[in-house]
């Protein structure tokens, strides 16, 4: 077996997952977005590198200094015309949409204006639409040893999602809505029934009081057209049910398997 690699610049590392499509493999490092393809001998090569604003430090609710995004391929025809990620700019994060073919940045759009400037999640991408979720201030039980200090050290978890649409002529992007959904998992779009599904987290007394070990967790369905919550159903309580911003898997029939800090939940939505 032959193993080949591409060296990153000094001080740059991969802290998130990667994404693959027929157009190549997308990698977000702590400094930039890369698209990797292969040369005539099958060795990996960098097609392009797109820098983003990594900010001045790791933020609370993120696990590394830099973008927390696994890059997302999306598009209206092939599903791979665009790539997207969320940067780590200090005071206001932005959603970047890049042409997969050329690496040209089509837009750098402010997002998550109500929930805090940070996201550790991979954005949803479908058609010309991207949906991002805030994890700013999320109380992870631990962070990687090499994560570095967060600035500030802690912050309240408010949550929130933003929908951004790429214009048909690729001249830019527009924000369609922003909500205050307190997503505790990586939101997923169910194209079969046209809903965003996730797990939400709520303080048992009042969300304004912040997160607590006694928080309750709910299966939630969100309307991608408006950002409104369609339903919430209690599925657990206390940090034993915390999905810590991990991604669930949807099985045939709509059943969701969601990991938590203590195991796996099987969630069958009520009809």
Summary of predicted features, one role per range:
Residues 10-22, 60, 66-70, 114-125, ...:
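Repeated scaffold domains used in trafficking and secretory/extracellular systems
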Residues 1, 38-42, 99-103, 166-169, ...:
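Short loop/turn segments that connect beta-strands within beta-propeller blades
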Residues 1-20, 24-29, 33:
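Mobile, glycine-rich extracellular loop/lid and propeptide segments
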Residues 81-87, 120-239:
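Loop/turn-rich, solvent-exposed surfaces of beta-rich toroidal or solenoidal domains
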Residues 1, 33-35, 95-98, 159-163, ...:
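Hydrophobic beta-strand positions in blades of beta-propellers and related beta-sheet-rich domains
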Residues 242-271:
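Blade-level signature of beta-propeller repeat domains, shared across WD40, Kelch, NHL, RCC1
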Residues 22-44, 50-53, 57-148, 155-159:
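Beta-propeller domains
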Residues 7-11, 45-64, 108-116, 174-183, ...:
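Surface-exposed loop and turn segments in beta-propeller and other repeat-based domains
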């Amino acid at each position: 077996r032959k193993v080949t690699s591409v060296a990153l610049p000094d001080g740059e590392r991969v802290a998130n997952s990667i994404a693959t499509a027929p157009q190549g493999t997308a990698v977000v490092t702590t400094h930039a977005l890369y698209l990797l393809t292969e040369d005539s001998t099958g060795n990996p090569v960098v097609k392009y590198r797109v820098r983003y604003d990594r900010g001045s430090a790791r933020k609370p609710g993120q696990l590394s200094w830099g973008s927390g995004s696994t890059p997302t391929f999306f598009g209206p025809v092939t599903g791979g015309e665009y790539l997207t990620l969320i940067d780590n700019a200090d005071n206001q994060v932005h959603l970047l949409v890049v042409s997969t073919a050329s690496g040209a940045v089509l837009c750098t759009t402010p997002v998550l204006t109500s929930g805090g400037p940070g996201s550790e999640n991979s954005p949803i991408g479908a058609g010309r639409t991207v949906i991002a979720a805030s994890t700013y201030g999320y109380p992870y039980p631990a962070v990687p040893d090499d994560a570095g200090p967060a600035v500030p050290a802690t912050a309240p978890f408010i949550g929130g999602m933003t929908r951004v649409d790429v214009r048909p002529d690729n001249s830019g992007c527009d924000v369609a809505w922003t909500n205050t959904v307190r997503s505790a998992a990586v939101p997923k779009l169910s194209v079969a029934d046209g809903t965003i599904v996730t797990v939400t987290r709520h303080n048992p007394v009042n969300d304004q009081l912040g997160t607590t070990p006694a928080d309750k967790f709910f299966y939630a369905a969100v309307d991608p057209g408006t950002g409104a919550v369609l339903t919430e159903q209690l599925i657990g309580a206390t940090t034993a049910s915390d999905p810590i911003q991990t991604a669930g898997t949807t099985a045939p029939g709509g059943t969701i398997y969601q990991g938590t800090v203590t195991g796996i939940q099987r969630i069958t939505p009520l009809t």
